[in-house]
């Protein structure tokens, strides 16, 4: 059995594991798929070559996200649209309704990623902010939620 944990965790010193893969304490859950946590699981499930390709794709996305041209940076464009919808239009929520059962967990995943980061009511210094922050994210596959949400 293997463990993926921080070096300060009791699991790191346990003799119950064949190997321990370490990750820094500051790495949040949204990054765990490309940390040792996800790396071990994805490599065992799909092979190390697939995991290497995932890391390459993540590196390409990082490069894309640094482009200052809004037309060539979909991440920046999406973020600015979100700020506009929330702060100018006043939309309090965002529905995610994928029309594929294969994406049935997408709304929950996006909810965790977005709301964990953007739903704060204080700034990085712990001071209250004087503007609205991220919207409430909710949803279901469109085939289930279409009559409930719209």
Cite the ranges covered by each PLM segment.
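Active-site phosphate/pyrophosphate-binding segments
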Residues: 1-150
């Amino acid at each position: 059995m293997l463990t993926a944990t921080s070096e300060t965790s009791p699991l790191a010193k346990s003799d119950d594991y064949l190997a321990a893969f370490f990750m820094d304490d500051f790495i949040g859950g949204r990054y765990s798929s490309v940390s040792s946590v996800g790396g071990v699981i994805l490599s065992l499930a799909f092979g190390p070559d697939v995991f290497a390709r995932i890391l390459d794709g993540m590196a390409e996305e990082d490069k894309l996200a640094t482009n200052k041209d809004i037309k060539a940076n979909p991440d920046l464009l999406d973020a600015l649209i979100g700020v506009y919808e929330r702060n100018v239009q006043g939309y309090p929520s965002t529905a995610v309704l994928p029309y594929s059962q294969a994406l049935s967990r997408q709304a929950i995943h996006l909810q965790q990623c977005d709301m964990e980061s953007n739903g704060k009511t204080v700034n990085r210094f712990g001071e209250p902010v004087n503007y609205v922050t991220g919207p409430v994210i909710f949803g279901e596959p469109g085939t289930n939620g279409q009559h409930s949400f719209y």
